[in-house]
Amino acid sequence: MKTRIHVVQGDITKLAVDVIVNAANPSLMGGGGVDGAIHRAAGPALLDACLKVRQQQGDCPTGHAVITLAGDLPAKAVVHTVGPVWRGGEQNEDQLLQDAYLNSLRLVAANSYTSVAFPAISTGVYSYPRAAAAEIAVKTVSEFITRHALPEQVYFVCYDEENAHLYERLLTQQGDE
């Protein structure tokens, strides 16, 4: 079977995939970390698209996702998903993080996109433990692509080598890489 899940270390804004997933905050207006980097690289068109979404629905709730155009990014679209803030693991964080991945994947598939790149959602300023977040990400994506034809290719884009190795280990254990 052809490998459908890949680990890449680098800058998610440079990837030529159909969809880049943005680890957004509820306002969708950009912020720090990967959210800010995606907004800066995409230019004003992305902010305008996010403003339109906000006018239609208000804030994006935790675990939900919305899709917009990609502005100046090499991608065709951006899925903005809001992951949970880590509060010790007793506030349904695992389910909310799983929902963030699932709702992103559903939007990718519903719009017939074939490739998607995910950052490590919630592991920056939202302080989700990296190993636990990676386990949820790998399990959720693996289960989804087993049951769905799209997306054909999924990339976990890691900012540093340590996180990339974490994802690679998990995928090797599952036999997906």
From Swiss-Prot:
Alphabetized PROSITE patterns for the sequence: MACRO
Keyword match Endoplasmic reticulum: no
Residues binding substrate: D11, I12, N25, G33, V34, D35, S122, T123, G124, V125, Y126
Catalytic activity: 3''-O-acetyl-ADP-D-ribose + H2O = ADP-D-ribose + acetate + H(+); 2''-O-acetyl-ADP-D-ribose + H2O = ADP-D-ribose + acetate + H(+)
InterPro entries: Macro_dom, Macro_dom-like, O-Ac-ADP-ribose_deAcase
Record domain Macro: where: 1-175
Entry-linked SUPFAM superfamilies: Macro domain-like
GO BP of this protein: purine nucleoside metabolic process
GO molecular function, one term: ribonuclease inhibitor activity
Listed EC numbers: 3.1.1.106
Active site residues of this protein: D35
Secretion signal span: none
Domain of life: Bacteria
A Pfam family this chain is assigned to: Macro
First-tier enzyme category under EC: hydrolase
Family per similarity comment: Belongs to the MacroD-type family. YmdB subfamily.
NCBIfam families: PRK00431.1-1 (NF001660), PRK00431.1-6 (NF001664)
Stated name of the protein: O-acetyl-ADP-ribose deacetylase
Organism: Shigella flexneri serotype 5b (strain 8401)
Classification of source organism: Bacteria, Pseudomonadati, Pseudomonadota, Gammaproteobacteria, Enterobacterales
Gene that specifies this protein: ymdB
